[in-house]
Amino acid sequence: MASRFIKCVTVGDGAVGKTCMLISYTSNTFPTDYVPTVFDNFSANVVVDGNTVNLGLWDTAGQEDYNRLRPLSYRGADVFILAFSLISKASYENIAKKWIPELRHYAPGVPIILVGTKLDLRDDKQFFIDHPGAVPITTNQGEELKKLIGSAVYIECSSKTQQNVKAVFDAAIKVVLQPPKQKKKKKNKNRCAFL
């Protein structure tokens, strides 16, 4: 039996770690230099909960220069991984201000996995000494944002340590294979019509 193809597209501000997350997941390595979106589309068979799927990963550039091109990669997406950096308040705020309106416009109804990246830096005291303007985003703030945008799942990860990186992509696959049940509207059985 052929495995199901799932198109997974990563979206979010530039420099939040989307490409690093993809490289960490697919090659178990962490690029030490900032490389703006050089991840080629990637496809591999992945087994999650006994189901084999062909996972297609698409990277996008978050920079404004790509605002007109980026939506072309949304076509046919089964799930979005919407990323912000846990050490960048601006990237967190842009989830609701920029990315959700864009995704809802170009790909309404496609499930979203909300991901907080750079988890290793959130508790790194030296990072905040070196970057006094940086404001960490808490897990509670991430959970609140998940509810606000209607995301299926919220996960925090570190591509550098690989903490929860596999969990991000497993969640993306699961939300496609087992979509959350929609709340059914109660039907009024005691209806009558006057003619």
UniProtKB/Swiss-Prot annotation:
Membrane-related topology note: Peripheral membrane protein
One GO CC annotation: nucleolus
Lipidation feature positions (S-geranylgeranyl cysteine): C192
Disrupted-gene phenotype: Fewer and shorter root hairs. Plants lacking both ARAC4/ROP2 and ARAC3/ROP6 exhibit long and narrow petals, as well as increased anisotropic cell expansion of petal epidermis during flower development, as a result of increased microtubule ordering in petal abaxial epidermal cells.
Superkingdom, natural source: Eukaryota
Disulfide bonds: none
Annotated residues for binding of GTP: 12-19, 30-37, 59-63, 117-120
Residue window of motif Effector region: 34-42
Transmembrane segments: none
NCBIfam families: small_GTP
Assigned protein family: Belongs to the small GTPase superfamily. Rho family.
Chain's role: Inactive GDP-bound Rho GTPases reside in the cytosol, are found in a complex with Rho GDP-dissociation inhibitors (Rho GDIs), and are released from the GDI protein in order to translocate to membranes upon activation. Involved in cell polarity control during the actin-dependent tip growth of root hairs, thus regulating root hair length and root hair initiation. Contributes, in a SPK1-dependent manner, to the prevention of cortical microtubules organization into parallel arrays oriented perpendicular to the axis of cell elongation to limit anisotropic cell growth during petal development.
Protein name stated in the entry: Rac-like GTP-binding protein ARAC4
Organism: Arabidopsis thaliana (Mouse-ear cress)
